[in-house]
């Protein structure tokens, strides 16, 4: 809800300008990434954002999947339902919501069918709530059943989905860090304390197992990207950053060196927030080379500690090496203590 296809993204400079204005004018405005009306869960969107880095590869995958599934149904070209747009929507839906445990079970299939039916009716092209087109909708649901039984499809889908999920986690952690440290009051929607891969509402209104979340938080003593699947890393970071309560002025920090466009950083009083962008690009070329992040003058001479990892971060010539800041995670939140 509230999205605009014409607003695909913003530059880092525009992001800093918006936050500077918010800190001055609307410091208590709500910052939210999921609501009861969200059309895709926040971590599903973080996965799909990876696709914008690899458009050619994504397009090739879509063509491959369509060819496999249409051939399996005895179809040549896009002649039978779903049409091209609805089929494309389905692949996005499947990729964004694909369960971490990888179970394509009956419950998940039912959720997919419900989401596709609602999307088709609200698009008002082939069907509507007032006048449902049962024939078209039935053909789409049959298509989903065929997907669930296609070994050829999953042989190409699963490796790609696993990669997008892994890279999407990095986007999720950046999104979470920005939400909890940028100016404004962060809003955490029920259930999104762990990975939120929900589909169109009301899929995002399913019961939440809070006992499981309490147990995870009690068990989590440190965070690592090596064990991201259970979502404990997101829950742990949420707790840490809420305790921090970054407030006060907003000071943009502009990185220096070869990969400046991959870093969004700012300071909130005695806190430095560093985030690494574009996970697919960084995976293809992981070397940070000479990229460094300047330390604001008021933090010089302080011991800087990453509250997420507990590690001390070294300053050299009033700068922090990006390779050190992002050694373990795509985010670092540094707190300064006087020496």
Please state what every model-predicted region is.
Residues 1-339:
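Carbohydrate-interacting/catalytic domains
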